[in-house]
Amino acid sequence: MLIYNQKFSVSPITTHIPLKNVYKKLNQKTIINNALTINRFYKNKLKKKPKIAIIGLNPHCETKTKLNEELKIIIPALKKLKKRNINVYGPFAADTFFLKNNLSHYNSIIGMYHDQVLTPFKTIFGFDASNITLGLPFLRLSVDHGPNVPMLGKNKSDTKSLENIFKFINSIE
């Protein structure tokens, strides 16, 4: 899952699982595959080599303790990605990463769980984005929000995300 806006995109490593299960699903392979897939998408579809920021799992993740996921999983994954010439940076603390002065330096931001990156992203852009499913042999785009059943038939839905899908498709073809 890549939530894309022209300014930057976000991608959670884990998606729709309870927060208490996130650390159990994290591993180097998943982080590496996510970053490689984003890198390939940016190079093939957007014709640029992205700068990818990785957000840590724990508060103040820059403080390295013996038992944290950053030291065991995230930092080794970053090192392996750098050896493959992928522009990755981090891990960054989630609570301050989405400040304006940080965002202009990166094309894509990988977080460890859904709300870690989607909450600040939607606070900044609202529904001015598209949901892109990466890793498929074809391009799959969707609106960046769920079905919003309570609004069905009320003519109140924001169409910005759907409009962005068409703009995006026209911009790359």
Where are the predicted features?
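Anion-binding alpha/beta catalytic cores of soluble intermediary-metabolism enzymes, centered on
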Residues: 1-173
